[in-house]
Curated annotation (Swiss-Prot):
Gene3D superfamilies: Cysteine-tRNA ligase, C-terminal anti-codon recognition domain (1.20.120.1910), HUPs (3.40.50.620). It holds the Pfam family DALR_2. It is found in: Cytoplasm. Monomer. This is Cysteine--tRNA ligase. One of its GO terms (cellular component) is cytosol. Binds 1 zinc ion per subunit.
Amino acid sequence: MIIYNTLTRSKELFVPLDVNNVKIYVCGPTVYDFAHIGNSRSIVIYDILFRLLNVLYPKVTYIRNITDIDDKIINVAQNNNQNIYDVTARYIKAFNEDMGRLNCLKPTYEPRATENIDVMLALIEKLINYGHAYICDNTVFFDIESYPAYGKLSGRNIMELIYGSRIDIEVGKKHPGDFVLWKPATDIDNKLMSCWPSPWGVGRPGWHIECSAMSYNYLGENFDIHGGGADLQFPHHENELAQSCCAFPNSYYAKYWIHNGFLTVNHEKMSKSLGNFLTVRQLLDSGIRGEVIRYIFLSTHYRKPLDWNDNVVSNAQESLNRIYMALNVTDERLLLDDVEVSDEIISCLKDDMNTPKAIAVLHEMVTRINKASDIDKKVYFIKVLIKSANFLGILYHSWQEWFKVDNDQDIIQLIHERKMAKTNGDFRKADRIRQILLDKGIVLSDNKDGTTLWYRS
């Protein structure tokens, strides 16, 4: 398998630390709201990686954390007169429901930050003892100048990192780029139950130490792959890497770093203030199927930017319609035990998770099915298509379910009249009937055997 390693800025042959247990850590959601489509793209991408690695290796340990303590969570809890656990319980449940509807597999473990406070405290103490962290007014800061390699992940020097990114300027820092490991509790923290005792007083962790603690607790000092969105590369992942390597001097933390590209909406950054902030829940409730959302994410290479717009949604729906149309051979569920996922699909994914190429292979399979005249061969091709598409997390419906076919007698009667008109050479009437049906939201597809498939658009 070849993957692009952000750390080395090059494609590399993936060589796991232990071929018997590949270890992955991916930054999961901060649960203060429903998951937006930018977050969800990342979840789908690493779901594909998880599926692929499970084919290539006997065991994969996939950790995807939940950030359940954060300023945004505290703000929501305060505004709704709740404690943080009420807020996070609601949105963790919603997140798992939404990702299930995108056909994402569950990770091996899904640790919560609040369940790993003791590990964070131990790491912070190590950093203080090793001279990489200092205390100022009950706040513990990481000293970035104590780590000479700081900036190697993002490829910029310290001054560029400071002036080119969002960094909190706080009184007491030795250096403007130093970041918080532990902060003292406020009155609001005490009220909302968002603080814990520590050697430096009651308080709560900084964001970056959370992921270092959870990855260490579940995967150890070193692991194979760290994934996340490109927006996390700096400062979050840079800070994770620095503090983990300093806490464990013989560690390099993650061997491979993978970052998926940004997502925009109508060529603009997604923002609540612009009114273009889209959540998966909103899209699902509007009638856009989870399979369509997933197909859109897979149609663009994970490292490239993706623009979400109406045309993208429409094209994905039409593409899936074409694939499902090819299944219109039998009304029965096909058993797939005697076929395997196409080698072409696996090869595409082994090349830096080239999902657009894998999608193209599915459409080549559809062409092969449509051209096949032998029914047994056609059914075999369909089974391989379904097995391969299922591996990508799509094509889980029967064609009847997808097109929502029912026994509407009025529609069937119009289709019969259209067929008779064509038989009698009255093509104008046939076209008028097709248009009448189209106006009703009914799409027709004429088969070579003279039958007509219809579905509601």
